[in-house]
Amino acid sequence: MFLPKWSLVTVAALATCMQVRAQDEAAMQESIMVMEAYSGKVLVASNAAAKRPIASLTKIASGAVAVDWATATGTDISTARISVPQTVTLVGGPNPMNLQPGDQMTVRDALYAALLASDNLAALSVADHVGRELISRRGKSGDPVGEFVGEMNRLAKSLGMTQTRFANPHGLERPGAKAFSTAADVARLSVYAMRRNAFTFIVRQKERQITVHGASGPRNYTIRNSNELAGETGILGVKTGTTSAAGPCVSVCMERDPLVRTKPDGSKGATPRRLIVVVLNNPDRFSRARSLIRQGWAVYDPWLSAGAPVKDKRREIISVPDPS
């Protein structure tokens, strides 16, 4: 039986509409991913491949790029100063430190503000500074923030984050600037970032004193971590994020003491254990993360004791390279 052309068009259009609706419904649901960082073992996953905005979890990529730049160039982030650019006036939103164009702070203090308190202007200031350095070293010209965001996207590609696109260094939604990721991709990014000691040192702090140098002199601020799990036993980071489009989000890294086992030859071997938990769009994200941490360990330890069997590597293991 042959359908008229108009019927085929109608069927195709209906199928497209149904697909879009399914994608929209998936984006309205919670997305979660729980994995063990060293083995790459996926422990719990739900809606983990749904593309959606991730709000300030974007700053994990910003922080990783900044730390990688500092390592590659031998920059001491505790002493190197950055200037707040004129473009901060275009960001909008809260400005808790009253940052003004021309204000200065160290790279590390700016990263404390961006990664702990999720300060968008601090994130933009880091991006502007590092972007200018990258442009200069590459003998190029252009928008420094755009250069920095390009570096974020290159990092994402190198990590296999195939469902991710960054549009800015802070994660705020902007008209015409489509940005998205998935719980699985954020987990990849979190594994990578938490391999960097300088990054980990920053995101595990509960609070930190920082100084902003302005026209009228230095101003001191206490920066507090927006991650409610910070300071709890074993918690190493990572980041929170919330916008109206993304909903409440969090990525958490937790570490346990290595598991020591006796080998057949009588020697002992230690297996490091580190969980990455990503929760996207859950109004009770911190309680959910705590529950998933318990669930993750309940799956991982028996799996490891059984010899870490893998039947389908593509589905069961997330391999995160270290391109740097």
Per-region residue spans from a language model:
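Bacterial N-terminal signal peptides that target proteins for export
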Residues: 1-7
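Penicillin-recognizing serine hydrolase domain
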Residues: 25-31, 39, 128-323
